[in-house]
A protein has these predicted regions:
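Active-site neighborhood of phospho(di)ester-bond hydrolases with catalytic His/Asp-centered motifs
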Residues: 12-16, 91-92, 114-115, 206-210, ...
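Mid-to-C-terminal alpha-helical segments outside catalytic/metal-binding sites
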Residues: 1-13, 22-83, 88, 253-258, ...
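Alpha-helical packing segments of well-folded alpha/beta enzyme cores
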Residues: 73-80, 84, 96, 128, ...
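Active-site environment of divalent metal-dependent phosphoester hydrolases
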Residues: 20-22, 96-99, 120-121, 148-149, ...
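Short, surface-exposed amphipathic charged segments that create phosphate/polyanion-binding patches used
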Residues: 126-132, 246-249, 301
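Active-site gating/metal-coordination segments in enzymes
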Residues: 87-88, 92-181, 185-188
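Conserved, mostly hydrophobic/aromatic
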Residues: 16, 81, 132, 166, ...
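Catalytic pocket-lining loop regions of alpha/beta-barrel enzymes
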Residues: 139-140, 152-258
């Protein structure tokens, strides 16, 4: 097993950071409109039953009583980023995302704008993407297929309109795949659906989020098959990274795996970067995983 190769001198690019914490964390999930059970509706973080030590939450398992009134926006993120050598982080902008907009305006050298459109909005979602790309330097589209109401599967025609625009504007799509943590049906996020999308859109850059479980072996085959398909590690504590993904990165897939965290939604950056030191990536994989692959996918000039 490869151990002890984590580089302390590589500044990371985090492809998933939120902007709100504490009771305001619920606002991170304003787009998750399909929750039905009362227990989930009472949660600040709708998948918190899966996590312990959720930052600034006394609702999750093993809470340590951390204060419930943390700063928000850049004041929340930058101290954690700085002490863990995270140079850049991708955050959400768009309607009802004032914190994200302010973070981009105040710290354009630290935050990367992404946007999660609602495919159910039809042409309006397309117009919003075009406007954000034109006026605000939009770098990526994000998607949570199981989280919409009605749900919009990965291969739905409503998504195809967005994929077509992403190809036109050269925007990558970061899309949740696999069983979702929130208590909504998983069918829209079956990993097998990605295969048809990559076939129909050979110029589309597609990055999976949230693990692709229980179909990790399948996504490994698809990563090998499709040159523009990537995998990001969002929502997984490093000690739980799938072995198949670590093995793939260490063999044929060093260019296809991107670092993504889950701060402050479910994981602390301090915990993530402590646990990363024990992930058995080969030395040559780390710079690509932490930084270089994201720079390439997002077209960054850093």
């Amino acid at each position: 097993m490869t151990t002890g190769t984590f580089p302390t001198d590589v500044a990371a690019v985090d492809t998933m950071i939120g902007t709100r914490a504490g009771p305001n964390a619920k606002l991170n999930y304003a787009n998750l409109t399909g929750i039905r059970d009362a227990d989930s509706k009472s949660m600040n973080f709708p998948a918190q039953y899966m996590f312990k030590d959720v930052p600034f939450s006394d609702q999750a398992r093993d809470s340590d009583g951390e204060p419930q009134d943390p700063p928000q926006g850049a004041d929340l993120c930058l101290p954690f980023m700085d002490r863990n050598n995270v140079q850049l982080a991708m955050i959400g902008i768009g309607p009802n995302k004032s914190e994200g907009r302010a973070m981009i305006d105040q710290h354009p050298d630290r935050f990367i704008p992404s946007h999660e459109p609602d495919p159910n909005d039809g042409p309006e979602s397309i117009r919003t993407i075009r406007r954000l790309h034109r006026d605000d330097g939009l770098r990526a589209i994000t998607a949570f297929p199981a989280g919409r109401d009605p749900q919009v599967p990965i291969d739905d025609p409503k998504m195809y309109a967005i994929y077509e625009l992403c190809c036109e504007l050269n925007l990558p799509v970061f899309c949740c795949a696999g069983i979702p943590g929130p208590r909504v049906p998983f069918a829209p996020q079956k990993v097998e659906l990605i295969d048809q999308v990559m076939y129909d859109f050979p110029d589309l850059t597609f990055v999976t989020r949230h693990g692709c479980e229980p179909w990790v072996d399948l996504v490994g085959k698809l990563l090998l098959k499709w040159p523009n398909l990537y995998y990001s590690t969002s929502a997984f504590a490093p000690k739980h990274y799938p072995k198949a993904i670590i093995d793939y990165a260490n063999t044929r897939g060093a260019d296809k795996i991107l670092y993504a965290g889950y701060f402050p939604m479910g994981l602390s950056l301090d915990r993530i970067f402590t646990e990363l030191r024990d992930v058995p990536f080969k030395a040559e994989v780390w710079p690509k995983f932490l930084r270089e692959n994201a720079i390439q996918v997002l077209g960054l000039d850093v």
